[in-house]
Regions:
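Domain-level signal for soluble alpha/beta catalytic cores
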Residues: 1-300
């Protein structure tokens, strides 16, 4: 369905990047290093991942939405997977297998997104490096994605401009559609203090506006900047259920799943003000209840 990417239509696309918190807190699954891709190595792990994806697809199907299935590869890059004992060859196999697993589950009205995360902790302090450093680092995983049936590459929870630029350039090298999702703090700014609008503009300027579109994830609607709905290059919001800060969420020992109906109403209000905002979904603390509530509120 690569000819039907979200920026080419006004249809509603429903996605979910909250699988890890769903797995840990609702399904009782242990995820060392917060990585879900190792679950694919066992029958039990594959079964529980299948259940998460099946719930998402059912939620979208109930409201005639297009589903974006994110591969469980957010932590499947070199530095983040190293503590799990994966060498380069094992990690390559894991990434390719993860996208294949999701593709095998896909039905009609489904997009396959090869999901990648930042080189370092998305919420921790990090010294910015040259975009070329991030390009070379992420080119490995993006190159593996190029060998799969993924419709696009989606970078989630990116927190500064140089890494976003490097990722997009690496995807551009291989002519792969790429989506860039920034995260913002409770004040609406990127963790390094950059305004979202400035981040989008600077990344576009440095990459020839190659990204298909931008998004925000791992943030509650209350935390968005006032100009959010005016940013037409930002076509998606994958929201947290909780209003807590990233620091509080990192230290949480219990799940804050918020109010699904309230979250759905908030995203529907944003979509009403910004019709270009057509990729919606749930991040930390969300599950199929939130996805149904979002679709119900938006399409009511």
């Amino acid at each position: 369905m690569s000819d039907s990417l979200p920026h080419l239509t006004d249809r509603l696309y429903l996605t979910h990047t909250g699988a890890e918190t769903d797995l840990i807190f609702r399904r009782g699954v242990d995820l060392p290093e917060f990585a879900s891709f190792p679950l694919l190595e066992t029958d039990a792990g594959r079964a529980v991942l299948s259940a998460v994806y099946a719930d998402q697809m059912a939620a979208a199907r109930g409201f005639d939405c297009v589903t974006i299935l994110e591969s469980p590869t957010w932590m499947a890059n070199g530095a983040r997977a190293e503590p799990l004992g994966y060498d380069k060859a094992q990690l390559q196999r894991a990434n390719i297998a993860a996208v294949a697993f999701v593709a095998d589950m896909a039905g009609a009205q489904t997009l396959i997104s090869a999901n990648l995360g930042p080189m370092a902790d998305a919420y921790g302090p990090a010294a910015h490096q040259d975009p070329d450093i991030y390009h070379d680092y992420h080119a490995q995983q993006i190159g593996w994605f190029a060998q799969t049936a993924a419709d696009m590459v989606s970078a989630y929870t990116v927190n500064h401009i140089p890494e976003a630029v490097g990722i997009i350039r690496a995807a551009q090298d291989l002519r792969l559609p790429v989506v860039m999702s920034f995260t913002v703090e409770t004040n609406g700014y990127l963790p390094d203090g950059t305004p979202l609008a400035a981040a989008v503009a600077q990344v576009d300027q440095q990459t020839g506006a190659y990204a298909a579109y931008f998004m925000v994830n791992c943030a509650h609607p209350d935390h968005l900047p006032p100009d959010f709905t005016a940013l037409e290059r930002v076509r998606g919001l994958v929201a947290n259920a909780s209003r807590c800060s990233h620091a509080d969420l990192d230290n949480a020992t219990a799940l804050d799943d918020g109010d699904p109906a309230e979250l759905g109403a908030q995203l529907a209000a944003l979509r009403a003000r910004a019709p270009h905002l057509n990729v919606l979904g749930g991040c930390c603390g969300t599950d199929a209840r939130h996805l149904r509530a979002i679709a119900r509120a938006v399409l009511a």
